[in-house]
Amino acid sequence: MRYKCVLMDIDDTLFDFMPGNRKAIALLMEELGLSSPTIFDEYQAINHACWQALERGEMDTGTLHVERFRRFLSEKQLDDDPERVADRFAQLLGQQVIPLPYAEETVKALSERLPVILLTNGITVIQKRRMAASPIRHWISGMVISQEVGCSKPDPNIFEIALNGVDPRDALMIGDGTGSDVLGANRAGVDVCWYNPKGKALPDGLHVEYEIQDLRQCLAIATQQ
């Protein structure tokens, strides 16, 4: 076959992240005594800025895990311990497992032909809890989490770790994130199958070998001769 292994993103590729994130934040804010209708958007603005800093290499995942809540609590003039709040959020989000359409059947089908390695910038405790609650765990050959290995997508080093000796030219990255999955794979010399269900435009300077709107389409791509 053309490829010897598949790398797959998790959030917004296999799991529908935002609904679970919204629910976890709503539960957390209720515990903090905050009930403004704009509270999620206020938190999300801070969270997004931290994730952008991570993709620029200015912050690691462990720092992000706490820093977003440190900034949020400061903005709200709350004296709660940001580490405690971050850990509670991780517990709540770890309970939210919402697979995207065809995610489970696609990973299962891929795993019958190729090793499937999950590659994520997520928080270790969150991703491990979510994966433990998903049948996807039975079909993957491994999971590389940025917080555990000390580098994050789009750093090509995390791709090298995930490949574990496989030539980058023999691997396929399947993911939705242009600033993480696509850019990182481009830098690492790995072909990209861009999962783009909303038909977004590809940012200038990036390239993909394949573009799909339905996860099932990646099976024929990954297993081509």
Regions picked out by a protein language model, each given a short descriptive name:
Residues 102-113:
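Catalytic-core regions built around general acid/base machinery
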Residues 2-101:
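N-terminal helical cap/lid subdomain that shapes the substrate entry/recognition surface
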